[in-house]
Amino acid sequence: MTNLSDQTQQIVPFIRSLLMPTTGPASIPDDTLEKHTLRSETSTYNLTVGDTGSGLIVFFPGFPGSIVGAHYTLQGNGNYKFDQMLLTAQNLPASYNYCRLVSRSLTVRSSTLPGGVYALNGTINAVTFQGSLSELTDVSYNGLMSATANINDKIGNVLVGEGVTVLSLPTSYDLGYVRLGDPIPAIGLDPKMVATCDSSDRPRVYTITAADDYQFSSQYQPGGVTITLFSANIDAITSLSVGGELVFRTSVHGLVLGATIYLIGFDGTTVITRAVAANNGLTTGTDNLMPFNLVIPTNEITQPITSIKLEIVTSKSGGQAGDQMSWSARGSLAVTIHGGNYPGALRPVTLVAYERVATGSVVTVAGVSNFELIPNPELAKNLVTEYGRFDPGAMNYTKLILSERDRLGIKTVWPTREYTDFREYFMEVADLNSPLKIAGAFGFKDIIRAIRRIAVPVVSTLFPPAAPLAHAIGEGVDYLLGDEAQAASGTARAASGKARAASGRIRQLTLAADKGYEVVANLFQVPQNPVVDGILASPGVLRGAHNLDCVLREGATLFPVVITTVEDAMTPKALNSKMFAVIEGVREDLQPPSQRGSFIRTLSGHRVYGYAPDGVLPLETGRDYTVVPIDDVWDDSIMLSKDPIPPIVGNSGNLAIAYMDVFRPKVPIHVAMTGALNACGEIEKVSFRSTKLATAHRLGLRLAGPGAFDVNTGPNWATFIKRFPHNPRDWDRLPYLNLPYLPPNAGRQYHLAMAASEFKETPELESAVRAMEAAANVDPLFQSALSVFMWLEENGIVTDMANFALSDPNAHRMRNFLANAPQAGSKSQRAKYGTAGYGVEARGPTPEEAQREKDTRISKKMETMGIYFATPEWVALNGHRGPSPGQVKYWQNKREIPDPNEDYLDYVHAEKSRLASEEQILRAATSIYGAPGQAEPPQAFIDEVAKVYEINHGRGPNQEQMKDLLLTAMEMKHRNPRRALPKPKPKPNAPTQRPPGRLGRWIRTVSDEDLE
């Protein structure tokens, strides 16, 4: 949608940059077409906390320039004192003439402690005020929260260690470029002369009626009598000018006036002083004119200006004590703030106040500002600029999303941890083809679907060549989500009359419920077609419904990759894993934009696209290859992924590339391969096998390579890869439940693999992991230390324990706690927990809890069968029983939830019984019990299959019955007397330790001995 020449584009870069500025700048897709360059500018400040431990940071989140904000510290007298301005790292006016702000985010938090302080304390309040800074009436720590009633624009009592993030959201669109106040060529007699070109469009003008026949009267005093003629609130952080005039009349001879204008900052101090008149003598009986014509350049405004004041000093030539002085005045002034009314320049403002932070601590402000910039003539000689791309669909989509930001949970101020967690949701919003899985969890899915339906057709309206793409996307939405999307947009939900069940796309929807797939329920059908009651659709499949080239029928080999994403200096790393496919040729059109243009050369000089250009791949290949991320694999097709995956590093994909180069399969090989090859062609072990194992098993694939469950690797890769079969996965097989090739104890191993946390593999990190493993094997104390670390990470208290260690450097408190802690098996422990052991209550569930668990189990079982009305509450009302056949038939025919305890016998029809032949039963039993060529199944198993056919009136087993038969077959195989006896396992010398629920990121989750 955002690139009319590239129909594979899914991301709207502008809204992605708005919601996640750390992803970089993007051109604003409006109709302001000027050649520009994109630039991302950082801002980093370490602010020292004052004596009171409190302070205030004022941000101008929408200001189109280098100014970011200002910092104030709270003094002992209750007033704020200006500390410093916050700017971007580069002074933009020095190199650029014009600017447009694209996006901006700033993070405020503290992670340092001054000397003598052992705990990080203090809290933060933050609020976004839709007015200007001078309009705030209460800037105290608690008073800030009353500045707005919008809950999405304020947060309170956030720990200073967690921090807050300020997100700039636009208040207007289709804006022009702003002149930055850049210096212009000029020559003057004064070497300090400076000439700049400031922004003159959209000025903010304050008109002040200074006096309307104001009467002044006083007695003479030495030095004159000073009065404040007026004081008014204004807002300025850029250049300003003051114009106007005052007219004075007097009847006293020898009066002398002086006038001074003061520009006052937010903290009440005078920033700029200008003498307008000095020793002006007044003539009696006439109008005495005092003109005002001031220009204040930007470089003299060193802090935000919030008010202006005019003082008049009255004196008398040759005056004596007691002489009368009087005059009257009238007139007006106009204060013009250049560019002050540009949206975002002076309003809104975001205020972040911190309190009770240790004196001397450092509060860090870090963030990024993204701009569209037009360089000055000198820089333009060496900097390439280009036009922005006009995309009405992307612009309309962005406007519609942000117009509903309150309903969609898009805030301007966030706790930093919450903002980091929301990044995946923001990526869903920016991706037009995303299935909105996270948005559905928050209840935002219908809103975004309706917005997509409105925004996407704009492309086909304005650009006819893009109509097929918009039509295909719209049809995909109507096909899978039409009823719910229409309901969200105001259209009544009703049967659409489309025979959706007859479509071949239903075949792409798997019943893999354990992957947490979302439910696309109640797809209405016409009477002559089968009814599809709630298909469980995977995110990849939903993405495929909108994407035109998501399914690729081509030979490929697969390998898993462990990757990390690094956001910025203030954001931690986040782990992710992905399956990749190796396909032949240069196919960058199938890659996501984040991977295109990156490749690595092999030893033979060929290229492998999708790898980071880091050295040479230690392989000799006969052709070029491309690696692409995938979401799923079915039979002879792979489903491509358009997730923003970075280029690959490391050597764990060498085995898959080598297999592809030698055998050149015509269909995807349904085995995930992992393994690095050395110069001798031998397979070397790779790290992070547990995470790769989880990635493979999410797709129902085996993991082949060093350390896999069931593949014995030889020393030479050519011998190893010949063992790979072509074993397509059945359509109705669950991804990783009861897989026949898993050993009986694989469930625990897989659980550990799923819970593991790893990092991107690099040679340095692999060496460090091996060194830690070797040290743990020879040093029991080090092994115990690693166990403690794993326990801390498993329970999420690593940071808490680190802070506790700072407050207890000699471990006195910890020793006392451990000495007094109840031991396992002690009297107090048995009295509290029974005999179940330390920390586990020895009691069963109450009858009510057991009944609720039973209702939940029945409901989940019904859900796997497509019966979604049987919620736990409905099952409880139905006498804690599942739905009867009559209730199910009533729901299928009427589309209404049946009443509990009503059998609906009128809807039950007796089924015709038909008998299955012995040959049919034997063939089915042989197919289920083992592969062709093996011994025939025992008679007991044939009898079990015959019972199933009898129960089903001559039909074959359903999913649940097939699962039970597979389990029965596995049990009978283990009891087969002809089966070789397993080798006896040696008894351990030491008692086995309780395995942790989740291992640490530095320890391999599955050892080689466990995998044999």
Swiss-Prot record:
Is the Metal-binding keyword given for this protein?
A: yes
Q: Where is the composition biased (Basic residues)?
A: 975-986
Spell out the residues of the site Cleavage. Answer: 441-442, 487-488, 494-495, 501-502, 512-513, 755-756
Q: How is it modified after translation?
A: Specific enzymatic cleavages yield mature proteins. The capsid assembly seems to be regulated by polyprotein processing. The protease VP4 cleaves itself off the polyprotein, thus releasing pre-VP2 and VP3 within the infected cell. During capsid assembly, the C-terminus of pre-VP2 is further processed by VP4, giving rise to VP2, the external capsid protein and three small peptides that all stay closely associated with the capsid.
Q: Which domain of life is it from?
A: Viruses
Which InterPro entries does the record match to this protein?
Birna_VP2, Birna_VP3, Birna_VP3_dom1, Birna_VP3_dom2, Birna_VP4_Prtase_dom, Viral_coat
Question: Where is region (Disordered) located?
Answer: 970-1012
The UniProt entry's GO CC annotations, sorted and at most eight, read:
host cell cytoplasm; T=13 icosahedral viral capsid
- Record bears the keyword Metal-binding: yes
What protein am I looking at? Structural polyprotein
Q: Which organism is it from?
A: Avian infectious bursal disease virus (strain Chicken/Cuba/Soroa/1998) (IBDV)
